[in-house]
């Protein structure tokens, strides 16, 4: 299973990359907005420059989302984003127009991450349109009292049935259990917020066991 980090914060990306387990990055307009000190002065060129900086840190796929909704503009932006770096993956929303843009861009060799996917039928369309990745948003489904991980299970089984090459990239992860369940279901990738990556490391028995070992080690050293 591959681990991506879901953030646009360069410090978080660097810290996660230093752990040695990071395979890629996903960003979106909301994540970028969080790190911008003055949104009114933040231009589209600034956004592209920021994505380039992310690509300098991580040697792996970096998803950057289009910021428009018409198919022609999504295609134009997608081509601009893909030109930033070979590792850039263009995120397009799973809409009628988004699907058109995905088909065009993927047909021209640009990798696509189909985002905002909330149903198996949307995931099938993403695969048919040539998306390299499909991003089911499990946390947002949980928020409306729908079992988000059930969607992941359905997509994995459908893709296995037809041997679609599209990778299942589980998004909107809220806690470590989402990651574990995604792994058990055979999802290809989990894109994880920085704080949840830290939570993956934690277990109270590890902490208590380490304390005991260190206490015993101090006795040995004294002897």
UniProtKB/Swiss-Prot annotation:
Assigned keywords, A-Z: Cytoplasm, Pentose shunt, Schiff base, Transferase
PROSITE patterns in UniProt: TRANSALDOLASE_1
Gene3D superfamilies with a match to the protein in the record: Aldolase class I (3.20.20.70)
CDD domains: Transaldolase_FSA
InterPro entries: Aldolase_TIM, TAL/FSA, Transaldolase_3B, Transaldolase_3B/F6P_aldolase, Transaldolase_AS, TSA/FSA_arc/bac
GO CC annotation terms, alphabetical: cytoplasm
Active-site residues annotated for this sequence: 91
Subcellular location as annotated: Cytoplasm
Superkingdom to which the source organism belongs: Bacteria
EC number: 2.2.1.2
Coiled-coil stretches: none
Biological function: Transaldolase is important for the balance of metabolites in the pentose-phosphate pathway.
PANTHER family listed in its UniProt record: FRUCTOSE-6-PHOSPHATE ALDOLASE 1-RELATED, TRANSALDOLASE
The family this protein is said to belong to: Belongs to the transaldolase family. Type 3B subfamily.
Protein name: Probable transaldolase
Gene transcribed to yield this protein: tal
């Amino acid at each position: 299973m591959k681990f991506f980090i879901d953030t646009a914060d360069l410090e978080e990306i660097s810290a996660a990359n230093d752990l040695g387990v990071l395979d890629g990055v996903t960003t979106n307009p909301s994540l970028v907005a969080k790190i911008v000190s003055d949104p009114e002065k933040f231009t589209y060129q600034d956004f592209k420059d920021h994505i380039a900086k992310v690509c300098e840190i991580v040697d792996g796929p970096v998803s950057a989302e289009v910021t428009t909704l018409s198919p022609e503009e999504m295609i134009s932006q997608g081509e601009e984003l893909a030109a930033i770096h070979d590792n850039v993956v263009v995120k397009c929303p799973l809409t009628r127009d988004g699907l058109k843009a995905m088909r065009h861009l993927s047909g021209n060799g640009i990798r696509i991450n189909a985002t905002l996917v909330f149903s198996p039928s949307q995931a099938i369309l993403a695969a048919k349109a040539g998306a390299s990745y499909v991003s089911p948003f499990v946390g947002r489904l949980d928020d409306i009292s729908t079992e988000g991980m059930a969607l992941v299970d359905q997509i994995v089984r459908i893709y296995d049935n037809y041997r679609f090459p599209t990778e299942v990239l589980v998004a909107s992860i809220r806690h470590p259990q989402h990651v574990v369940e995604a792994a058990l279901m055979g999802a290809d990738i989990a894109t994880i917020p920085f704080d949840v990556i830290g939570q993956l490391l934690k277990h109270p028995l590890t902490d208590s066991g380490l304390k005991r070992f260190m206490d015993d080690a101090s006795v040995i050293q004294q002897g």
